[in-house]
């Protein structure tokens, strides 16, 4: 293999640039040319492809976002769109593709593989919801962003003796809510993977208030429901002054943490190695701090699950 491509797709995550840098430099080190595909699968269909040199990925390891840009592309879900993408890859002489992104990005890589074009998926999403890896690129940075917000909100919650509901990202996965809630000492954590009883949530808040606790932090993953609705219900049921903060897209931005930079560097390099070994249709990950790779179709067939021990611990510590 003498020429490979790299693209980022779906929602951006801090550390994607570090992964791009790793792919480019690892490949060039082994005498392989690298072409960047701009604007994800939409750019692939449009032929928005440019050769990348070592200098093109200099001074980006510390930057959030993605220098290749990203976009969602419904057209690529069609057979016609996939064929257009493959035509562009062949037109540019690209023999293998590294796809950095989440579940939808992996689906695209799987389709290309089924059409006979070798792809390797690299998990890049703040949601940490990709099977086959303990951590995804961007999760640690997003987690630290949320924890920083929790710490600041707790200061004002304490000063004004208020209850605060903080809504975080996670439509289908509660990792951000669970990990940030545990690290931030939240009194209640609500995640999509676990049922909850609103009456129980309110009763726990009242019990805490009765023993002298005048402020509380509640973390709600967006997939559970609207933080604004939860705040309204809590204030109406308890009479406690309640405020709501929806963190939104601030969770996707910022300079990646050291952990995410190292993780991205390791995973990006391993993706290149797999392509050079002739192993397409794979996705890379990290488990027990060891690099692993899986069949991408099998990984997609599995469902991400929450760490039940951590969830149980969060409930034990939030009495």
From Swiss-Prot:
Name under which the protein is recorded: ATP-dependent 6-phosphofructokinase
CDD domains: Bacterial_PFK
PANTHER family: ATP-DEPENDENT 6-PHOSPHOFRUCTOKINASE, PHOSPHOFRUCTOKINASE
Primary localisation category: cytoplasm
GO molecular function: 6-phosphofructokinase activity; AMP binding; ATP binding; fructose-6-phosphate binding; identical protein binding; metal ion binding; monosaccharide binding
Needed cofactors: Mg(2+)
Protein encoded by which gene: pfkA
Residues given in the record as Mg(2+) binding sites: 103
Summary of activators and inhibitors of this protein: Allosterically activated by ADP and other diphosphonucleosides, and allosterically inhibited by phosphoenolpyruvate.
One Gene Ontology cellular component annotation held by this UniProt entry: 6-phosphofructokinase complex
Binding, substrate: 125-127, 162, 169-171, 222, 243, 249-252
UniProt keyword Mitochondrion, yes or no: no
């Amino acid at each position: 293999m003498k020429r490979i491509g790299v693209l980022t797709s779906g929602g951006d995550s801090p550390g994607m640039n570090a992964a791009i840098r790793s792919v480019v430099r690892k490949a060039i080190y082994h005498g392989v040319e690298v072409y960047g595909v701009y604007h994800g699968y939409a750019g692939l269909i449009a032929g928005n492809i440019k050769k990348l040199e070592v200098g093109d990925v200099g001074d980006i390891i510390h930057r959030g976002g993605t220098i290749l840009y990203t976009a969602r592309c419904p057209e690529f879900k069609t057979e016609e769109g996939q064929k257009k993408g493959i035509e562009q890859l062949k037109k540019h002489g690209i023999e293998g593709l590294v796809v950095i992104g989440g579940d939808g990005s992996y689906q695209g890589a799987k389709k290309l593989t089924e059409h006979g074009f070798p792809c390797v998926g690299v998990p890049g999403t703040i949601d940490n919801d990709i099977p086959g890896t303990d951590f995804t690129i961007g999760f640690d940075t997003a987690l630290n962003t949320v924890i920083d917000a929790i710490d600041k909100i707790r200061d004002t919650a304490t000063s004004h003796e208020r209850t605060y509901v903080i809504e975080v990202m996670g439509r289908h996965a509660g990792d951000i809510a669970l990990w940030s809630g545990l690290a931030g000492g939240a009194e209640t954590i609500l995640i999509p993977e676990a049922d909850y009883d609103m009456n129980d949530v309110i009763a726990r808040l009242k019990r805490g208030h009765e023993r002298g606790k005048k402020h509380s932090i509640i973390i709600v993953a967006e997939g559970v429901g609207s933080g604004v609705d939860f705040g309204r219900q809590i204030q109406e049921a308890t009479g406690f002054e309640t405020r709501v903060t929806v963190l939104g897209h601030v969770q996707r931005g910022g300079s990646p943490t050291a952990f995410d930079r190292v993780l991205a560097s390791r995973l990006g390099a391993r993706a290149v190695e797999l392509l050079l070994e002739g192993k397409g249709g794979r996705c890379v990950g990290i488990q027990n701090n060891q690099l692993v790779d899986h069949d991408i179709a099998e990984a997609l067939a599995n469902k991400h699950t929450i760490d039940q021990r951590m969830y149980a611990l969060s409930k034990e510590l939030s009495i």
